[in-house]
Amino acid sequence: MRALFPLIMAASLATSVFASPDASADFPVVRRPGFVAAHAALPGGRRAETNAVIIVVSVADQALALISGGEVLHVYRVSTAVAGVGSKPNSEKTPLGWHRVAEWIGGDAVPGQVFVSRKPVPGEILRHTQWRGDGGRDYVLTRILWLDGLEYGRNRGPGVDSHSRFIYIHGTNQEHLLGRPASHGCIRLSNHDVMAVYALTEGRPTYVEIVDRF
């Protein structure tokens, strides 16, 4: 029980304080029998660790489902790339397929902290009133989950590598665009939601499957 306490506290904090209202009512497919099982097998048929988190991002639905303990815990609205899906460098497209979270960045940052090249910019913090558009600029805010592709030739390796393309899940100052494509390749979440996802996944094996639709 003691080992589970940090996870229970993180889940409680993430769902009750940070996270936006669960959006699964708008995506009933995620609550249907078989949804979790359909996203349980990693590339090569490998099964995820028992304490793993599975994140499924649907491009068509512009939504992210977080799976833990064999159930969907929460569905969040996202923005993927306005240019569509793809894996080529400089395409500004969101890559499909399986990834893992390679690095969690910004766990101690205050909400609205601006990051450049994954480093917090001292003194540059956007207030919550600036999270719904700030002069048209696209900021990386609050938290970063840096993705690493797991499928060689699709999102891993020369010419398609998600990690070297700096594909992140991150907070944004364009929260008003969530629910529709708007990014330059990354997966945007609201700043409260990215804090929730960070809290629920940090230190645990976390796999991200980016799909055309749920």
Predicted segment positions?
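N-terminal pre-domains immediately preceding structured catalytic cores
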Residues: R2-F214
